[in-house]
A protein has these predicted regions:
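A generic short alpha-helical patch detector that favors 3-5-residue windows
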Residues: 3, 87-90, 108
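Active-site activation/catalytic loop segments of kinase-like enzymes and analogous catalytic loops
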Residues: 92-125, 138-158
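ATP/Mg2+ or Mg2+-diphosphate-binding catalytic cores
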Residues: 145-185
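ATP-dependent phospho-/nucleotidyl transfer catalytic cores
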Residues: 1-60, 115
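Active-site acidic catalytic loop and adjacent metal/ATP-binding pocket
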Residues: 43-93
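Gram-positive cell-envelope targeting signals
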Residues: 20, 35, 78-80, 99
Length: 185
């Protein structure tokens, strides 16, 4: 998260120096403070939690779990596919990736998010340390960072309209996302 935060600042500084700003750059300038504050809180909170409780236990993780990597078969059987990012890590990171992708697609629907987490907790109960870790993962504005990072590392002569739309959608979903964050805190 610290590296991502440095990348956010680098992109903001680049945009600040530009005289003529595109719609995307103006959108970033208008929303940066809110998302960067969350990014700092997430990084600081996670670091403090690890200093206090130590590193969470590591397990094998999928590394990129989302709805595209789960196959449903007959009779309620499931299979997880594409383990090319598998690694040893904190298991709730897989839960975070899966849940975040689903919630982004469903406008951060609080009931859906809580049902997903409660169902997971029934099968594999989360301890207090994992819950805190999960909260800070959700707090970090990963999608915002992805958009800014894509912008910074791409050619800036032409910025896709889709990038502006994605930023606007993030801003529109912020209230619902904050409600979800309050519920899991």
């Amino acid at each position: 998260m610290e590296r991502h935060n440095r990348e956010l600042v680098r992109t903001r500084n680049y945009i600040r120096k530009k005289r003529r700003k595109s719609d995307f750059e103006r959108a970033v300038s208008g929303s940066f403070a809110i998302f960067y504050e969350q990014a700092q809180e997430a990084a600081g909170g996670l670091k403090a939690q690890i200093e206090q409780d130590g590193e969470p236990e590591n397990y094998l993780c999928h590394g990129d779990l989302n709805q595209h990597h789960i196959l449903l078969a007959e009779e309620n059987e499931m299979a997880v596919i594409e383990f090319n990012r598998m690694h040893r890590g904190v298991q709730v990171e897989d839960l975070y990736h899966f849940t975040r992708k689903i919630l982004e697609k469903h406008g951060w629907d609080l009931r859906l998010g809580m049902r997903l987490l409660e169902t997971y907790d029934r099968i594999l109960p989360l301890n207090a340390q994992e819950r805190i870790y999960l909260y800070y993962l959700f707090l970090y504005p990963e999608k915002y960072w992805k958009q800014l990072n894509f912008y910074y590392n791409a050619g800036k002569a032409w910025i896709p309209v889709r990038s502006i739309e994605k930023l606007q959608k993030l801003e529109e979903q912020q209230t619902a996302r904050n409600l979800f964050l309050e519920a899991i805190r």
